[in-house]
Amino acid sequence: MALTKLRFVNQFSQWLCVRKGYIHSLPENLAALQKAIEVLKTKHDDVKRRVDKEEFLGRRHRLSQVQVEIERLCFCGFCSKSFGKSYHYGKMVSVMLKEVENLSSRGVFDVVTEENLVAQVEEMPIQSTVVGQETMLERVWNTLMKDGFKIMGLYGMGGVGKTTLLTQINKKFSETDGGFDIVMWVVVSKTSEIYRIQEDIAKRLGLTGEEWDKKNENKRAVDIHNVLRRHKFVLLLDDIWEKVNLELVGVPYPSRENGSIVAFTTRSRDVCGRMGVDDPMQVSCLEPEDAWDLFQNKVGENTLKSHPDIPELAKQVAEKCRGLPLALNVIGETMACKSTVQEWRHAIDEEWKKTEVKMHDVVREMALWISSDLGKHKDQCIVRAGVGLHAVPEVKNWRAVRRMSLMKNELEKILGCPTCPQLTTLLLQKNHKLVNISGEFFRFMPNLVVLDLSWNSSLTGLPKKISEVETTNTSEFGVHEEFGEYAGVSKLLSLKTLRLQKSKKALDVNSAKELQLLEHIEVLTIDIFSKVEEESFKILTFPSMCNIRRIGIWKCGMKEIKVEMRTSSCFSSLSKVVIGQCDGLKELTWLLFAPNLTYLDARFAEQLEDIISEEKAASVTDENASIIIPFQKLECLSLSDLPKLKSIYWSPLSFPRLSELAVQEHCPKLKKLPLNSKSGTAGVELVVKYGENKWLEGVEWEDKATELRFLATCKSLYR
């Protein structure tokens, strides 16, 4: 019995000590609990900023319950004088302290963070330096960091460096702690589909999985919005072509309250306005010095020093890039391995400035690879242009060749008699040393469709046997200087393209009459002169050519060009005209009969006074001259070195499609332009471009409204 009582006393003492310990340790435990909960809250706050999945909300709710209990204990526990209540609170504090310590020690939040954490900024490949854009980058960044600035639009032409600039901004966010939780990059492009934009944003936020994939655009927008509204974010949208509705995507609109930022690039200033940007930033082409620095970096010092003439030629090539970074990069990289003067001159050489597209070697090689059925039929297409050939290259299988280009080489003689039953295209132009072509060379080319022998200044004659080629399919035939006789060109009845320009021995009037027999001619470039001085031979009469699409007239000694059929449809297909070095011509009124003309370039014509003469217009047409309104489809008008030019047209024209009216140089008497305040208002922005400030200052505008309309948008051709 005594033993039983002793055991009871011991157990009661232990029980009492435990309870006394709860009460005695209550202040200490409560302080420890408060400290532990602060640590736990710090972890909670850190994770809260980075975790986007809704499952995390349950843990936050549990933590908030713990916090409420602590506050209640702090308020009630110490105030109670009841042993029972003090014991009860003391025990609760001790238990909760262990729970909090257990939560922290188990690393619950670390696991969550590891599973849901996304990088603040997604790093992207980028150039180490941005030649010529440092100032622009600093300006954009400072504006973005300015308090209250929340949405930015960068606009500029394609290839000017907008994407590069935005990539640099993305990089600066990774290097600078601006307090942003996440930076998102989305490439939008022409197909600005809401669904695809949402997908790219969701990947950055960690919103993935089967459940997400099943949601429609509206539900996705809600999920994205619920995540982003709790965060300070940056959204970078690259290459947008139309307004992106942020609300439909689910992106909260940036404001001073949420501190978020949206920045985008576009080619259109109008898009900036539709996105709510009142003062967008224009990304312009590089200044000449910066452009030259970039081009030099791409070409490399070794190439520039490989020949004393190359630096000057390189500057000419760089100038043709007009400060466009994409062109400077691509062409600079292409020319980096060009160490001969010939290769650099080849890069500079141009024929039709407005109708040719430069193609660098990589793109050309890829195009040839594709055209040869991914390399399977590479023997069918032989391109050796501008590589310094002195003789026709050896070909293993002439029978397989369908297209061959040997243009711009050093060929002196073309000999042999290859059998080419499948050859359709042969380009031999611009071989300035070429003096002789064997008559047998063309003998076994029965399917030749395109033959270009133009710009061969040393070639003394056309092979006599070329007319013996058994073909009725020839559709393009070009010849050039000092071929002696052009008679017989009209026998090529299927001829579609004839190039005779820039000849030392130009086409005479009698030979020009044969042109009217070319019923299918579409492209014609010719030099014409008269052998006699009589005025009757100073007039060139064009036949009606309904199919012709392009005409280039060079070194024309005629004083006047007429047409046989004086109706508005006799040149109904003509779209492009170039007039150059035609010192006798005083007007080009015959263009009234080209209703579909889109491009007109007139240059180096010392006597040219009018493009369309009012006096001539009244006499040259069988129709009422007032009914024929010229240049309704004209898109580009370029004038240069026309010292006597006074008028383009005698009254203002609507120019519904004209986008560029360029007066380049040496047109001092052209004071009045055929423009009024309503010209070019049909949807296309009409811009007047000029080469000389003095000319622009002397323009006599139709009225004040016209001056205000066009003067503000005039652009220099050399800036």
UniProtKB/Swiss-Prot annotation:
<keyword id="KW-0677">Repeat</keyword>
<feature type="repeat" description="LRR 3">
    <location>
        <begin position="447"/>
        <end position="469"/>
    </location>
</feature>
<comment type="similarity">
    <text>Belongs to the disease resistance NB-LRR family.</text>
</comment>
<keyword id="KW-0433">Leucine-rich repeat</keyword>
<dbReference type="GO" id="GO:0043531">
    <property type="term" value="F:ADP binding"/>
</dbReference>
<dbReference type="GO" id="GO:0005524">
    <property type="term" value="F:ATP binding"/>
</dbReference>
<dbReference type="InterPro" id="IPR050905">
    <property type="entry name" value="Plant_NBS-LRR"/>
</dbReference>
<feature type="coiled-coil region">
    <location>
        <begin position="25"/>
        <end position="73"/>
    </location>
</feature>
<feature type="repeat" description="LRR 2">
    <location>
        <begin position="422"/>
        <end position="444"/>
    </location>
</feature>
<feature type="repeat" description="LRR 1">
    <location>
        <begin position="400"/>
        <end position="421"/>
    </location>
</feature>
<feature type="domain" description="NB-ARC">
    <location>
        <begin position="114"/>
        <end position="418"/>
    </location>
</feature>
<dbReference type="Pfam" id="PF00931">
    <property type="entry name" value="NB-ARC"/>
</dbReference>
<feature type="binding site">
    <location>
        <begin position="156"/>
        <end position="163"/>
    </location>
    <ligand>
        <name>ATP</name>
    </ligand>
</feature>
<dbReference type="GO" id="GO:0098542">
    <property type="term" value="P:defense response to other organism"/>
</dbReference>
<keyword id="KW-0067">ATP-binding</keyword>
<keyword id="KW-0611">Plant defense</keyword>
<comment type="function">
    <text>Probable disease resistance protein.</text>
</comment>
<dbReference type="InterPro" id="IPR002182">
    <property type="entry name" value="NB-ARC"/>
</dbReference>
<dbReference type="InterPro" id="IPR032675">
    <property type="entry name" value="LRR_dom_sf"/>
</dbReference>
<protein>
    <recommendedName>
        <fullName>Probable disease resistance protein At4g14610</fullName>
    </recommendedName>
</protein>
<dbReference type="InterPro" id="IPR027417">
    <property type="entry name" value="P-loop_NTPase"/>
</dbReference>
<dbReference type="InterPro" id="IPR042197">
    <property type="entry name" value="Apaf_helical"/>
</dbReference>
<dbReference type="Pfam" id="PF23247">
    <property type="entry name" value="LRR_RPS2"/>
</dbReference>
<keyword id="KW-0175">Coiled coil</keyword>
<keyword id="KW-0547">Nucleotide-binding</keyword>
